[in-house]
């Protein structure tokens, strides 16, 4: 059996994000780009990450820092819980929780990422991180309090 895609889609990697990371296809929308970028972090593919950051971010300038993070971070899972791709042409959003261990310490990134489409390609531009109280419902949709879920 083939390897499942790290993005959490429950599809085989060869039928999911591999086509984007290999350059065979461009991600068709923000949610697919979000998933493929998460897979690139898992696969330690700095080239793909840099290629999919918006050119204004000058991602090439922090390649060394990115690659250093690969050796310290183990990615544990992605939950994409909201996507808004059609309100403004050429701009889209994807909200997610990405769980990880960094130097054996658990953590989570909770973000609403913003993507821009230029010349037919979607790029990650930036993101905002919500302020979540420990007793607030977890934004991943589990129904648990944040402190008992992604906030651990």
Swiss-Prot record:
The record's annotation in InterPro entries points to:
NTF2-like_dom_sf, SEC_C_motif, UPF0225, YchJ-like_M
Pfam families, per the entry: SEC-C, YchJ_M-like
In terms of superkingdom, the source organism counts as Bacteria
Query: Which PANTHER family does the record cross-reference, listed alphabetically?
Result: ADENYLATE CYCLASE-ASSOCIATED CAP C-TERMINAL DOMAIN-CONTAINING PROTEIN, UPF0225 PROTEIN SCO1677
UniProt lists the family membership as follows: Belongs to the UPF0225 family.
Name it: UPF0225 protein KPK_2103
Lineage of source species: Bacteria, Pseudomonadati, Pseudomonadota, Gammaproteobacteria, Enterobacterales
